[in-house]
Amino acid sequence: MYDISKWKHVFKLDPNKEISDEHLEMICESGTDAVIVGGSDGVTIDNVLHMLVSIRRYAVPCVLEVSNVEAITPGFDFYYIPSVLNSRKVEWLTGVHHEALKEFGDIMNWDEIFMEGYCVLNPEAKVAQLTEAKCDLTEDDVIAYARMADKLLHLPIFYLEYSGTYGDVELVKKVKAELQQAKLYYGGGISNVKEAKEVAQYADTVVVGNVIYENIKAALQTVKAVKGE
């Protein structure tokens, strides 16, 4: 079994976006610690299955980040269930989770399932609009969400999500200092080695996504930048 607490770098693939077989092979053979499959919209059982079958040709660990209960399928190593802590809609805090447990609770392997406490910080991002996230947060607001995830809810992952834009590294540093047991995931706007290294100083796990579709070479370079190998 893989140990997610040791993952430093992961790629995130959107099942609703096209990626060539050649680029997928590069991603899966890059030395990244895992590949997360997930997106904010257009996630279906068909495109999730297509992505799963494609990734399973390689040895890399594979995670489904659940945003649509109807797109859940067996075959992934782990399942990440996001709870958007700064969402104004209860369905993104506990609603989707309740639905999933009603449908799959009897057959869930709890060793494969991890909750993520998301704090979404880019109001322009699809995920912010979908979840109606309150993004105009102060530093104290964000730290309070981090403490909530870590100390009140005892979540294994606190995820700072800037989705499409590069975030505030000083804030990442301060959030990391607050967390005792939760691992800090950072996602958003990483497009080069410099940014990847900068964030990796503080985040436990750096998530690289959009740049895969914009500049595959730059995406691949982030692996060594983060892991220092």
UniProtKB/Swiss-Prot annotation:
Homodimer. CDD domains: PcrB_like. The keyword Metal-binding applies. The keyword Magnesium applies. The gene is pcrB. Gene3D superfamilies: FMN-linked oxidoreductases (3.20.20.390). Its cofactor is Mg(2+). Keywords: Lipid biosynthesis, Lipid metabolism, Magnesium, Metal-binding, Phospholipid biosynthesis, Phospholipid metabolism, Transferase. It comes from Bacillus cytotoxicus (strain DSM 22905 / CIP 110041 / 391-98 / NVH 391-98). This is Heptaprenylglyceryl phosphate synthase. Its EC number is 2.5.1.n9. It is an enzyme of class 2 (transferase). Coiled coil: none annotated. The lineage of its organism: Bacteria, Bacillati, Bacillota, Bacilli, Bacillales. Mg(2+) binds at D14, S40. GO terms for biological process: glycerophospholipid biosynthetic process.
